[in-house]
């Protein structure tokens, strides 16, 4: 198991209310110990942690402390924020306290730390498509152990999973005053705070509020060399638009009272990130698009870029792009001990990098006159015990940073995690996959069968066979990328099916997988009959389902079941029986999935992931969200509510308790008005909450699952919106 921090952080129930001076931004303290270490005993006697995969998602930026050695913060697009401790050699997740009504706060669009105090950290949080776009400033004075939540939705919204999310930083602390902050919004212009982020006021001097790509003001950079009277007098603001559309760099020399466009910037490019050298120069990376990848309309291809040096006093520009390179550039950092030593990274560039293809990193020792391609010079990757990294590169390298207090070392972010080198000037430089404690995958499926290891399906990186949840598992091979559907045959051990852009079947528990010869549509969901002989596939975006009885060699259309996002679920006993929930009724098939008929009416809005009681035919449980939890004992002909469950987002089963015959039931739901993870040892007659407010993870996310371990009593797994697969186990076995 991962090292458990022998420290129980007392619950902190603090409610703070404050009215904003400029607008109705509401403030409330997170009523738990947010940022507490992931694997600590919860109030219910459970230890919660992440199933170890190792990274797996886009880390959009890293911000090392300039005042305290060994401390850095990282932000991600859907998995929250993390704090690195060199002393502990791991990352600590900071936002596991986020509830289901705050899931969007796991998308971090900006991060700032006080340059003089690493304990003071601010996050700009929100995702446009979650929680009605709720956006907030999260403010901490204790390294992210607790946060104050300042709701800013009424003033501006952000999108931590939007285009340009690796740019920035759009949130900055004034180097002359730790309580003054600046924020470049995506649609509503420039904002300032004079009270540490509690209240925000719009700065109307900047004439830009929004951009055509909805990225807006992507860089806000107060100049430390300009501090006078307790605040920076000079500010630079980068705008995410082509210079041909309008100025994309503005400058203020009077603490933001007035702004003027900076002439001479590249016309056909957009600024990505920027860094001062402390000697009068500003370095900016550019690309033809906000990134990290092209837009669908083709207006921002992200296939070209440059690096420029701006002389602040002389108001002049110099192109310092590595000679011969036209690729898009993103990350940039300057050695704080040597203003002539720079590092930059490309983005959306896929060139040979060891056994894979990815971005390039360049170092200059003469202010950009000459560059060394540190990847081409000699590249060594250390997977640090994460076996699936084989064949995967550093890519989407949106942020690269020298360690300010040990500038031989450098960090670079990637679409699959974070890498660090202890000596970027070494030949070869060894880049270590530094992701212990940082789990940022989107789980989409999970199977636990008696006598077999846990098996997962995730976005981007297929999924894994997990022999031990504390150690990274074996990635499914052949790899197909995002795997949206996974199922197992209840009565044929070792038989499973998974689907993404291809469909594969295994008969040996995932040691080997064989592609089906045919497929009607891609991705979506798939069900496998209890004997493993029949497959029912609901392709993504399709309004019909398909059935195969020859391991995918041929497919026929399923009758009686039409509608998008439907999914079939196999009965665990009878191989001829399948079920589906179509948002108004329970549908059943008695002919091996060839046709479905309506059995019973059900309220709309429930989870399409029906759960069948293990080892019993026709015993169905349906999570109806606000409709609670219902159960059928007659194959879906009738349903009865499970008493006491007012809300249920997911239901699953696990191994029975010692001395019990009935499987343990687990739910993500509300009992007694409190939402959380619950278990029942008596098939739903009584419930015990087994998580606490510090371990909510934003709820079950896109995977919509909660799965009990069929081999270990009391162990339960849950999907998240971007924090990987989390699991709880009794603190006392």
Each model region followed by its residue ranges:
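Extracellular glycan-interacting surfaces
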Residues: 16, 28-733
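Bacterial N-terminal signal peptides that target proteins for export
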Residues: 2-13
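Bacterial N-terminal signal peptides
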Residues: 12-23
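Low-complexity intrinsically disordered segments
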Residues: 1-2, 23-24
């Amino acid at each position: 198991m991962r090292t458990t921090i022998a420290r129980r952080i007392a619950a902190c129930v603090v409610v703070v209310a404050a009215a904003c001076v400029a607008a109705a931004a509401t403030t409330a303290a997170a009523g738990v110990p947010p940022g507490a270490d992931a694997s600590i005993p919860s109030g219910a006697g459970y230890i919660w942690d992440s199933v170890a995969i190792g990274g797996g998602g886009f880390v959009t930026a890293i911000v090392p402390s300039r005042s305290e050695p060994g401390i850095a913060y990282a932000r991600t697009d859907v998995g929250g924020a993390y704090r690195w401790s060199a002393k502990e050699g791991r990352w600590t997740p900071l936002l596991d306290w986020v509830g289901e009504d705050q899931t969007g706060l796991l998308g971090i669009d900006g991060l700032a730390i006080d340059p003089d105090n690493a304990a003071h950290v601010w996050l700009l949080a929100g995702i446009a498509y979650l929680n009605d776009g709720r956006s907030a400033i999260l403010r901490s004075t204790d390294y992210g152990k607790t946060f104050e939540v300042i709701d800013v939705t009424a003033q501006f919204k952000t999108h931590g999973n939007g285009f340009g999310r690796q740019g920035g930083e759009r949130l900055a602390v004034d180097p002359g005053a730790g309580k003054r902050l600046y924020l470049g919004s995506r649609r509503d212009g420039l904002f300032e705070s004079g009270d540490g982020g509690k209240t925000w006021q719009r700065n109307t001097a900047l004439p830009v509020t929004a951009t055509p790509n909805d990225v807006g003001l992507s860089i806000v950079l107060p100049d430390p060399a300009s501090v006078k009277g307790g605040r920076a007098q000079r500010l630079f603001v980068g705008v995410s638009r082509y210079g041909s559309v309008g100025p994309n760099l503005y400058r203020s020399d009077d603490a933001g009272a007035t702004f003027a466009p900076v002439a001479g910037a590249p016309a056909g490019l957009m600024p990505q990130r920027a860094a001062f050298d402390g000697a009068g120069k500003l370095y900016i990376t550019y690309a033809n698009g906000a990134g990290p990848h092209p837009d669908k309309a083709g207006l921002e291809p992200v296939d070209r870029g440059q690096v420029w040096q701006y002389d602040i006093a002389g108001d002049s520009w110099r192109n310092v792009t590595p000679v011969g390179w036209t690729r898009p550039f993103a990350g940039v950092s300057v050695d704080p001990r040597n203003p002539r030593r720079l590092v930059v990274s490309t983005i959306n560039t896929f060139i040979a990098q060891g056994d894979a293809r990815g971005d390039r990193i360049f170092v200059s020792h003469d202010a950009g006159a000459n560059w060394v391609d540190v990847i081409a010079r000699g590249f060594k990757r250390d997977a640090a015990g994460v076996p699936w990294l084989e064949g995967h590169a550093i890519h989407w390298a949106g942020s690269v940073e020298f360690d300010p207090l040990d500038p031989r070392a450098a960090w670079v972010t990637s679409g699959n995690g974070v890498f660090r080198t202890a000596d970027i000037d070494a030949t070869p430089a060894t880049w270590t996959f530094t992701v212990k404690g940082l789990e940022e995958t989107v789980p989409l499926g999970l199977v636990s069968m008696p006598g077999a290891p846990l098996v997962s399906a995730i976005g981007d990186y297929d999924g894994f066979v997990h022999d031990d949840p504390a150690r990274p598992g074996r990635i499914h091979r052949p790899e197909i990328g995002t795997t949206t559907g996974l199922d197992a045959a209840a009565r044929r051990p070792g038989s499973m099916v998974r689907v993404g852009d291809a469909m594969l079947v295994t008969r040996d528990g995932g040691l080997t997988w064989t592609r089906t010869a045919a497929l009607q549509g891609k991705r979506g969901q798939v069900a496998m009959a209890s004997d493993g002989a029949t497959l029912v596939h609901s392709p993504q975006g399709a309004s019909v389902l398909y059935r195969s009885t020859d391991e995918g060699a041929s497919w026929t259309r399923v009758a009686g079941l039409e509608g998008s996002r439907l999914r079939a679920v196999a009965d665990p006993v009878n191989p001829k029986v399948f079920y589906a929930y179509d948002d108004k009724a329970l549908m059943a098939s008695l002919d091996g999935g060839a046709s479905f008929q309506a059995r019973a009416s059900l309220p709309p809005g429930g989870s399409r992931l029906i759960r069948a009681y293990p080892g019993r035919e026709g015993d169905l449980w349906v999570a109806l969200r606000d409709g609670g939890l219902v159960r059928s004992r007659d194959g879906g002909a009738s349903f009865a509510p499970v008493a006491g469950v007012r809300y249920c987002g997911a239901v699953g089963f696990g191994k029975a308790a010692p001395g019990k015959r009935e499987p343990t039931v687990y739910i993500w739901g509300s009992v007694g008005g409190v939402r959380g993870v619950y278990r029942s040892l008596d098939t739903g007659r009584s419930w015990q909450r087994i998580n606490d407010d510090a371990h909510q993870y934003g709820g079950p996310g896109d995977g919509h699952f909660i799965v009990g371990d069929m081999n270990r009593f009391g162990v339960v797994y849950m999907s998240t919106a971007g924090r990987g697969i989390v699991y709880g186990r009794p603190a006392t076995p």
